Amino acid sequence: RDIFWNPKKGFRIIQSFIPMLGENEFHIWNQSFSLFLPYSKTVTLALNTTMQKKYGYKNDVWINYFGNSFNIRGWKLPKKGSSLDNFRFGHEFIFSSFEVRKIVLSEKASVLGLSKGLCFVGFIDGGVINKNWDDINMDNLIGGAGIGVRIPVPILQSIRIDIGWGIKNKMFNKNYAVHLAIQQKF
């Protein structure tokens, strides 16, 4: 896999096991599988699936949510009064993302030997989350779709700006959400 700001071909597998020790001990097992396929010289198809399983103590302090720039895009951040029982919250999840990445500006800069570029992206995300793996079902499936831009930045890889619309029950949300992040989603 190309490890720079915009991978063009190859694959990446990430596994992590995170122990949270103490009075209310738990362990998190994360898995991420990514595939990058060159479609043309300037277009890359990128696919990712990420899963999380949590073992041990589960409470609402360490709960995860869908709707940020690193999982299901197109959803606004949850409000403070959001119910933790809703379809966007849980401890265990699986989600997938598909991106079409198109380089629209690519050149080598002579200033400090840094590369410049600009990449436009179309994306579709989808996944399910729940408090327990056994309770995960397709009735809680949510998604997001949209477009974005990637601006390469030395050391940080890239600045990522995405605009998306959430999808639930085969209907798009009326309002869009803007997500700003550093690095590619995967």
Where would I find each of the regions flagged by the language model?
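C-terminal outer-membrane beta-barrel translocator/porin domains of Gram-negative envelope proteins
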Residues: R1-L118, N130, I182-Q183
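One face of beta-strands
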Residues: Q31-F33, G143-I147, V178
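Short, contiguous acidic/charged loop-to-helix segments that flank catalytic cores in large enzymes
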Residues: S82-F89, N132-N140, I167-K170
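A structural signal for short secondary-structure junctions
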Residues: G90-E92, V111-L118, G122, D139-G143, ...
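Outer-membrane beta-barrel transmembrane domain signature
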Residues: E99, I103, C119-A145, P154
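Conserved active-site loop/cleft motifs that coordinate metal ions or position small ligands
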Residues: V121-F123, Q157-G164
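Active-site scaffold segments
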Residues: G146-P152, R160-D162
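Outer-membrane beta-barrel "beta-signal"
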Residues: I151, N175-F186
